[in-house]
């Protein structure tokens, strides 16, 4: 997308200038897109995914026009550090483009003998065995990559970092309130239509409860990081001062934020998503340990805050809003051997799938059409996706591209940990916590589900990953 002299110019070190009104409007438009993405079935329909990419491309094109006019630029320090993960995303999209590029049969046979054998037409062939699906996959992937770039380009001040986190909290709270209301009222509506799946559990405007759970965890990560940045660092002496502190808390925006987090936890429990809930509390605990380890000194306030999330959310809120049913579902794993074995066999057969296309993959988005060729008699039914993001990326894109995506996430996680170790600014440290928690959630939940194949969740995830580089390299109280 950007190379050569343009790479140097886009982050040219110039005298800091104030944000132009147009650039501010683009930031607002990008935030609106982040809120829109989960609404039309999590953008997991071709029309919705295409519209999402079109909206992101329009904002990116407008930003480039401002850049060419000298009225916008990526912060130099952010660009210097974040261009490597951006290039990794671009390289993956270039690989998907190659998958749908017609090549001589001899080249296809050398790169992917199985693909060459399975093609039924003559002439030049493609590495992808489903050209249309991979074409849409590329379109969607370009949109996700644009989302990562727009974060780097537009979230360029302390105020915008805070606003970005607040936008995710707002969107997550809205999804949570809507999903919980639909369950508790019995209306059972999704996105302007009656739900045809997930009745009796919270799904919001998503179709799958596990994907709403994943989205809520990312929004909870943003809210938790925001709340951590607001922890008081003043020492309190005496019961009168402590009472005044509690009264100030009840009247402060911090208390409202805590209520929003509670609403999201209620909806998370109401999804009855086993791994969604397990991944949330595991990610919260592990990210908390990372934050405590990264801190310059042990913080009892942070320990108390994290403990309050566990105690209040799990015992009190969960008890009122169906934690017992979630626990029954977790305990009922032994009685659902068939379901668990179906996941085992899916993973088993997907490994055979990967062995057939180890280097090139079968083409982005082609899993639904190729997997039946490897599906044995132990696994019945039709599957659009593997219930394992790691395996699906490997099967469709090939192992090298899948490892590149793992490297992309690992780089962002490392940067998030460094933010918590080296930065003093509480907001940026809170943002680093949010990224760390989101990555740990994805690492856990991706073993049993396909959250990252859902456009809204993938866009939200890469936006949070970009925040690691933003919070690690923005100067304090300064912006371009």
Report residues per predicted region.
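Alpha-helical transmembrane segments of multi-pass inner-membrane proteins
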Residues: 2-40, 50-65, 89-93, 97-100, ...
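Juxtamembrane membrane-water interface segments that cap and precede transmembrane helices
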Residues: 39, 116-131, 193-205, 331, ...
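Cytoplasmic juxtamembrane interface segments
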Residues: 65-81, 148-161, 322-345
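Helix-loop-helix transmembrane hairpins and adjacent membrane-interface loops
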Residues: 66-98, 103-105
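Aromatic-rich transmembrane-lumenal/periplasmic boundary elements in polytopic membrane proteins
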Residues: 96, 100-116, 130-133, 178-192, ...
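TM-adjacent membrane-interface loops and short helices in multi-pass inner/ER membrane proteins
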Residues: 99, 208, 335, 344-384, ...
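Peri-membrane helix termini and adjoining interfacial loops of integral membrane proteins
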Residues: 107-123, 185-198, 234-240, 324-329, ...
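Short, charged juxtamembrane terminal tails flanking transmembrane helices
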Residues: 476-480
């Amino acid at each position: 997308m950007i190379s050569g002299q343009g790479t140097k110019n886009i982050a040219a070190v110039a005298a800091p200038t104030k944000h132009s009104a147009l650039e501010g409007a683009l930031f607002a438009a990008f935030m609106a897109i982040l809120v829109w993405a989960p609404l039309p079935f999590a953008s997991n329909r071709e029309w919705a995914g295409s519209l999402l990419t079109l909206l992101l491309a329009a904002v990116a094109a407008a930003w480039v026009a401002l850049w060419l006019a000298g009225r916008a630029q990526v912060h130099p320090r952010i660009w210097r550090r974040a261009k490597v993960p951006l290039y990794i995303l671009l390289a993956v999209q270039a690989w998907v483009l190659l998958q749908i590029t017609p090549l001589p049969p001899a080249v296809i046979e050398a790169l992917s003998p199985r693909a060459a054998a399975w093609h039924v037409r003559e002439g030049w062939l493609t590495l992808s065995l489903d050209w249309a699906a991979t074409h849409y996959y590329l379109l969607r992937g370009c949109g996700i990559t644009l989302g990562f770039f727009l974060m780097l380009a537009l979230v360029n001040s302390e105020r915008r970092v805070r606003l970005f986190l607040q936008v995710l909290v707002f969107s997550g709270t809205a999804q949570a309130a809507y999903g919980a209301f639909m369950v508790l009222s019995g209306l059972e509506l999704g996105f302007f239509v009656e739900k045809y799946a997930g009745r009796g559990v919270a799904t919001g405007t998503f179709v799958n409860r596990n994907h709403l759970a994943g989205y809520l965890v990312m929004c909870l990560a943003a809210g938790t990081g925001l709340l951590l940045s607001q922890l008081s660092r003043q020492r309190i002496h005496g019961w009168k001062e402590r009472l005044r502190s509690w009264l100030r808390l009840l009247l402060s925006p911090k208390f409202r934020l805590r209520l929003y987090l509670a609403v999201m936890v209620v909806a998370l429990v109401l999804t009855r998503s086993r791994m969604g809930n397990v991944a949330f509390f595991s990610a919260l605990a592990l990210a908390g340990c990372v934050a405590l380890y990264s801190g310059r000194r042990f913080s009892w306030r942070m320990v108390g805050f994290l403990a309050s999330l566990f105690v209040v959310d799990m015992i009190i809120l969960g008890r009122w809003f169906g934690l017992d049913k979630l626990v029954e579902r977790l305990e009922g794993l032994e009685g659902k051997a068939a379901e668990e074995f179906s996941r085992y066999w899916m993973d088993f057969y997907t490994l055979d799938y990967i062995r057939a296309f180890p280097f090139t993959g079968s083409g982005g988005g082609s899993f639904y059409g190729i997997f039946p060729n490897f599906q044995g008699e132990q696994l019945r039914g039709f599957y659009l996706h593997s219930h394992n993001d790691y395996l699906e990326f490997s099967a469709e894109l090939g192992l090298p591209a899948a490892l590149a995506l793992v490297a992309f996430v690992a780089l962002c996680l490392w940067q998030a940990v460094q933010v918590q170790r080296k930065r003093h600014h509480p907001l940026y440290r809170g943002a680093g916590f949010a990224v760390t928690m989101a990555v740990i959630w994805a690492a856990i939940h991706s073993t049993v589900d396909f959250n990252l194949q859902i456009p809204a969740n993938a866009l939200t995830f890469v936006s949070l990953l970009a925040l690691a580089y933003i919070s690690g390299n923005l100067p304090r109280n300064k912006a371009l």
